[in-house]
């Protein structure tokens, strides 16, 4: 389904289904077969959403066929690199003394439940109301307890989320740690700029920010990716990113933040694999996405 300006979704449709897909990949990375990350909540959350293909994926029921292009090791390794990047970002931020955290587009992220937050840490989770409600109720049914003070901010990021965040107790006068994981590609360019302008306006000196971006979303229309997508569709993976993302080049986000006083450090997906002791795949599909860029930044003003 092609995006519209005011489209809505839950965890089984449109952009929301990508959150379930990401959680399924985290579940694989946490599975004892790979044991690359620690996330005991990913698999039960995916099963609760009940999208057939992702339930089968976390249950090990997707047939492995070399000709299909489905490599069961690729998903957990790539997601482990991504998850470790954001996990370490929050560990470093809180060790520096930051006690206020904001997870933008939190989806099925369970960091408020699974990370060992220092005493006094407040974690704000921002996402669509139905997404927040589903995760909260599902984790409660699982008996999960937050390891920090968790505050939910149920709002569409295309609306005045900054006001809703502050109404939930966010204090813009103290440093904060922000993440925008798996978000930017689903925002129009002007909305991306507005998002970071809001983050800057709400951030005290010393605040930190982590995000990843696809330098040029034309990769989702690359012939190599389209061929791979067709093969994966036969296995039931129906999400077509080409319809869900907003196209254009996004590398300028670093310059945008620099003008506002953010000092950034970036690593490509290929570099992140190497830093985690993992080999980046050497094939056409991997080559398409080798330049996905992971960035952390500190606000100096």
Swiss-Prot record:
Q: Which UniProt keywords apply?
A: Methyltransferase, S-adenosyl-L-methionine, Transferase
* InterPro entries to which the protein is assigned, alphabetical: Ppm1/Ppm2/Tcmp, SAM-dependent_MTases_sf, SAM_mthyl_Trfase_ML2640-like
What parts of the sequence cross the membrane? Answer: none
Q: Name one GO molecular function term.
A: methyltransferase activity
Its EC number is 2.1.1.-
Top enzyme class of this protein? transferase
Domain of life of the source: Bacteria
Stored Gene3D superfamilies: Vaccinia Virus protein VP39
BP GO terms, sorted: methylation
Query: Where is S-adenosyl-L-methionine bound in this sequence?
Result: 127, 156-157
Q: What does this protein do?
A: Exhibits S-adenosyl-L-methionine-dependent methyltransferase activity.
What protein family is recorded? Belongs to the UPF0677 family.
**Name the record gives this protein:** Putative S-adenosyl-L-methionine-dependent methyltransferase MUL_0450
Q: From what organism does this protein derive?
A: Mycobacterium ulcerans (strain Agy99)
Q: What taxonomic lineage is listed for the species of origin?
A: Bacteria, Bacillati, Actinomycetota, Actinomycetes, Mycobacteriales
